[in-house]
């Protein structure tokens, strides 16, 4: 954990969702293995790992602005199934997978309580990549939605996190929700997330302080500046609630 001093100035917390509050890896595994069975394939862990690599590569291209979201959603399945000589339609695969994923909202233990307690002291907003309908469904069914004053999704922003345009959209939405001059109050904001490439880079691009939620103890190999780093919710509490 890194912390400069005890006099924190933050009034607003911007939270990532997947693998920060919700266990996306577990939800993804459930949805993808159901998809394999649907197309007559054995749901092996090795196939899940192969899909992970393809999916991550596609989303990284999206974050860099080199691939459109719709292309990501289809191409990841087209690439995977073509490698296994399976005549699966990309749109059918995406629709099936998306439905299963939207039905799965597995909380990281302590996430609900953390957001509840933080919401008593700070204004909380969601900043997430992904499909809007899916993210809204998962946030609602998990019980997290009630603690956030706004939910900002890349699909609706028409720009991916970490791009500056995504955060321009977020600031404008905050203004429409009644926040006065949010862009000029960036020094009061802290972005909390697990991803160096989308969350920490996003905060850097937006001029917002960042808190890298890093429970796996990964190394910062992306040359991204991080304001503070934590490995647990307990450390977030120590910084923001005490």
Label for each model-derived stretch:
Residues 1-13, 116, 132, 136-242:
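Asp-based, Mg2+/Mn2+-dependent phosphohydrolase catalytic module
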Residues 38-39, 83-84, 121, 173, ...:
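Alpha-helical structural context
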Residues 128:
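Conserved phosphate-coupling serine/threonine residues in phosphotransfer and NTP-handling enzymes
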Residues 27-30, 106, 113, 133-134, ...:
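Short alpha-helical
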Residues 7-109:
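N-terminal helical cap/lid subdomain that shapes the substrate entry/recognition surface
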Residues 121-123, 207:
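Glycine-centered short loops/turns at secondary-structure junctions
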Residues 110-121:
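Catalytic-core regions built around general acid/base machinery
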């Amino acid at each position: 954990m890194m912390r400069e001093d005890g006099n924190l100035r933050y009034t607003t917390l911007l939270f990532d969702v997947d693998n920060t509050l919700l266990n996306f890896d577990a939800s993804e595994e459930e949805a993808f293995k159901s998809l394999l069975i649907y197309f007559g394939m054995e749901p092996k862990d090795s196939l899940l790992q192969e899909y992970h690599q393809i999916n991550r590569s596609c989303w990284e291209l999206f974050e860099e602005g080199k691939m459109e979201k719709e292309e990501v959603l289809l191409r990841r399945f087209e690439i995977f199934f073509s490698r296994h000589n399976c005549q699966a339609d990309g749109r059918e695969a995406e629709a099936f997978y998306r439905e299963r994923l939207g039905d799965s909202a597995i909380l990281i233990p302590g996430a609900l309580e953390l957001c509840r307690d933080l919401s008593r002291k700070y204004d909380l907003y969601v900043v997430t990549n992904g499909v809007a309908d899916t993210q809204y469904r998962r946030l609602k069914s998990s019980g997290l939605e009630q603690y956030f004053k706004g939910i900002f999704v890349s699909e609706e922003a028409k720009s991916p996190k970490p791009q500056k345009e995504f955060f321009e959209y977020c600031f404008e939405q905050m203004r429409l929700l009644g926040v006065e001059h949010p862009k000029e109050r960036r020094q009061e904001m802290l972005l909390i997330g697990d991803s160096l490439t989308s969350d920490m880079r996003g905060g850097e691009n937006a001029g917002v302080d960042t808190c890298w939620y890093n429970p796996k103890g990964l190394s910062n190999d992306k040359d991204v500046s991080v304001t503070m780093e934590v490995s647990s919710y307990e450390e977030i509490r120590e910084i923001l609630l005490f």
